[in-house]
């Protein structure tokens, strides 16, 4: 039986990793989320980190957002170049899974060649 989860090595877990992507990553806005993308040091490594502030809503809303984003990233991960991504919500609405998957697949490669920092 295969595990249908995002493996631990595909996630940004430590504060230092998040800070690195926030400082060095290129900001890219999609309809539902804001992305910070930085090229990975290892060409085949694709990692995601998710940040959701308490302004977004109660805990069950924040957790649902994170579940949807993790699943969307898991589905598009094999088609992405090596990168580290921090994803945060835009607005207070829950993202649509299919639309989010398409946005991730389109926006992440767009942001990578322009690896210089930019403001959101």
From Swiss-Prot:
Entries under InterPro entries matching the protein: Ribosomal_Su5_D2-typ_SF (IPR020568), Ribsml_uS5_D2-typ_fold_subgr (IPR014721), RNase_P (IPR000100), RNase_P_CS (IPR020539)
Major enzyme class: hydrolase
Keywords linked to the UniProt accession: Endonuclease, Hydrolase, Nuclease, RNA-binding, tRNA processing
Coiled coil: none
An annotated GO cellular component: ribonuclease P complex
Catalytic activity: Endonucleolytic cleavage of RNA, removing 5'-extranucleotides from tRNA precursor
PROSITE patterns per record: RIBONUCLEASE_P
GO biological process: tRNA 3'-end processing; tRNA 5'-leader removal
Any one GO molecular-function label of the UniProt entry: tRNA binding
EC numbers, comma separated: 3.1.26.5
Pfam families recorded: Ribonuclease_P
NCBIfam families: rnpA
Protein family (similarity comment): Belongs to the RnpA family.
Subunit (UniProt): Consists of a catalytic RNA component (M1 or rnpB) and a protein subunit.
Role, per record: RNaseP catalyzes the removal of the 5'-leader sequence from pre-tRNA to produce the mature 5'-terminus. It can also cleave other RNA substrates such as 4.5S RNA. The protein component plays an auxiliary but essential role in vivo by binding to the 5'-leader sequence and broadening the substrate specificity of the ribozyme.
PANTHER family: RIBONUCLEASE P PROTEIN COMPONENT (PTHR33992:SF1)
Identification of the protein by name: Ribonuclease P protein component
Species for this entry: Chlamydia trachomatis serovar D (strain ATCC VR-885 / DSM 19411 / UW-3/Cx)
Lineage of producing organism: Bacteria, Pseudomonadati, Chlamydiota, Chlamydiia, Chlamydiales
């Amino acid at each position: 039986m295969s595990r249908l989860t995002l493996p631990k090595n595909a996630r940004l877990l430590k504060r230092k990793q998040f800070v690195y992507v926030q400082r060095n990553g290129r900001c890219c806005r999609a309809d539902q989320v804001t992305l910070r993308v930085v090229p990975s040091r290892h060409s085949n490594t694709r990692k995601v980190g998710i940040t959701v502030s308490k302004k977004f809503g109660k805990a069950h809303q924040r957790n649902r957002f994170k579940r949807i984003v993790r699943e969307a990233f898991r589905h598009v991960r094999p088609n992405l170049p090596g990168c580290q991504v921090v994803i945060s919500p835009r607005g207070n609405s829950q993202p649509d899974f299919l639309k989010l998957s398409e946005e991730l697949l389109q926006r992440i490669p767009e942001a990578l060649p322009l690896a210089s920092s930019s403001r959101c």
